[in-house]
């Protein structure tokens, strides 16, 4: 019997890879696969699965390691190797199948995403490496819990430890979180992975894995535990981590320059980022319908002849060309695509005005004027299913023209 066959037959963790695969598949289709087209968002999305994969894997590894903690169980490993070697093989039996499942998922999700991103793929590769180290860390954590607490108490302790560690060291944006592998729930276009962040994260995880796998365990007063010196050092290290990590400022992403180079049409000309090229036809169709509505209302000359997609959080537009941002809900494959309702407000909104980006938001009167102007344009275009709150009345042609002109000149009520 080969070692691989033996491990599959006698260990729980390799079989748990099927459960991990189910988690990965669920994560793949969750929320309508909104990440399609964006490289960084795609990689970050697949990393969110570790929130569930980690504790499940830790629990499975604890079962197998716990069985080896029983006296006389060395016979479970062929070849009669040392117990330390047996634990390493048991850890590998949990780690390798889980990593294989994850890497297959990463490959599939990247093929589905079919990203045409303008940014370098290497930082994303480093982020995937950190995810792989995260999987290995959770398996090592489970193995230690099994060694210390056995095959009955060890698994629930390992699962709980995985959850607690994630909430403590994996949920703090803006700080270094060594268990944060993905949290992007909306477009991160215009951002790139911070390679230094993920290299440090990978190094921290590698050190922790080494420490967990080489942890000495002794039977002291009938209880399996590390020596007193190791216990004291571990307590100091945990306290230091609780104090140090929350105060260490670090960003997972850094800004990167991208340009909306995928364009179509003339008057209006619509340009999107290559990552979002699937929205190009819908955006052009909606913009053309809105310009036709503007012509019927006598304001076509005030509407932009070119619309360019903007990144989330972008500052004032440096030119007079129109801007638009794809709504979050439109990224799902359940969405009907971009419509006039999505672009009407953005065709009127003066993205070049610094007043829109200050600490104080524009007045309620500005919001009311914008709502009425957008509603008037949509009504003239025959839009249906308007998601906005309909105003008490739409605008006359003269009032609409005056409002849009004041917006273009950054004059707000």
Model-assigned labels for residue ranges:
Residues 220-254:
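Internal/C-terminal transmembrane anchor helices
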Residues 273-284, 291, 298-413:
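Extended repeat-based interaction scaffolds and adjacent low-complexity, acidic/S/T/P-biased segments
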Residues 20-24, 153-166, 228-237:
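Central hydrophobic cores of alpha-helical transmembrane segments
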Residues 59-97:
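Helix-loop-helix units of permease transmembrane domains in multi-pass membrane transporters
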Residues 1-17:
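Aromatic- and glycine-rich beta-strand/loop motifs that create alpha-glucan
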Residues 261-277:
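Acidic/histidine-rich, surface-exposed loop or edge segments in extracytoplasmic proteins
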